[in-house]
A protein has these predicted regions:
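Class I (Rossmann-like) S-adenosyl-L-methionine-dependent methyltransferase catalytic domain
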Residues: 1, 5-53, 73-80, 94-144
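A conserved beta-strand element that flanks and buttresses the S-adenosyl-L-methionine
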Residues: 65
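Short catalytic micro-motifs in class I SAM-dependent methyltransferases
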Residues: 68-72
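Conserved helix-to-beta-strand junction in the class I
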Residues: 84-90
Length: 144
C-alpha cells in the first residue's frame, strides 16, 4: 500500500497503478481543485486532507511518499507534517524530497526558482533537522 502526501491530481498514483494494478494506493492534497480534477482512474483513491493531520491510523501504509510538498511548511507545521508521514508508514518506510542547496550558487538559484517555498535549507541543515525531530525516513534533495 502506498500513500502520496501532496498528490495533486494523482499522476504518481496513476503511474503506480500502471506498474501494478493490484497496488493499494491513496493520495491526499490540501487543494480542493487538484482533487476535484484528479485523473479519473485515481479519483476513488484521493481526497482533500492536510499533511499536518493525516486521516489514517498508525502504520497504515507500506510506503508513504511526499515529493516537494513539505517545503510549503515551516516551524512546527514542518515538523508535524514529517512526523505524520512517518506515523502512517510501516517500519518508517517514508520517502520525501526537499528543496536544498550545497553552496551559495545553488541557494541563489533555489531562491529565484521557488518563490512559494517556505523552507529551503542547506543539505547539512536538513540532515540535522531530521535528526533533531526524529524523522527516520528516507530523503533526497531537489536542487535546481
Amino acid at each position: 500500500s502506498i500513500l502520496d502526501v501532496g498528490c495533486a491530481k494523482g499522476f504518481m498514483l496513476y503511474d503506480f497503478l500502471q506498474i501494478n494494478p493490484k497496488f493499494k494506493v491513496a493520495g491526499i492534497d490540501i487543494s480542493e481543485y487538484a482533487i476535484k480534477n484528479a485523473l479519473e482512474e485515481v479519483k476513488p483513491f484521493v481526497r482533500v486532507a492536510d499533511a499536518r493531520e493525516l486521516p489514517f491510523p498508525d502504520h497504515s501504509f507500506d510506503l508513504s511518499i511526499s515529493i516537494t510538498t513539505v517545503h510549503n511548511f515551516e516551524g512546527e507545521d514542518l515538523k508535524r507534517s514529517l512526523l505524520e508521514l512517518q506515523r502512517v508508514s510501516k517500519n518508517n518506510r517514508s520517502f520525501i524530497t526537499v528543496d536544498a542547496y550545497r553552496n551559495d550558487e545553488e541557494k541563489k538559484r533555489m531562491e529565484a526558482w521557488n518563490l512559494t517555498a517556505k523552507t529551503m535549507m542547506h543539505v547539512d541543515e536538513w540532515k540535522e533537522y531530521f535528526f533533531q525531530i526524529g524523522y527516520e525516513g528516507d530523503f533526497y534533495w531537489f536542487i535546481p
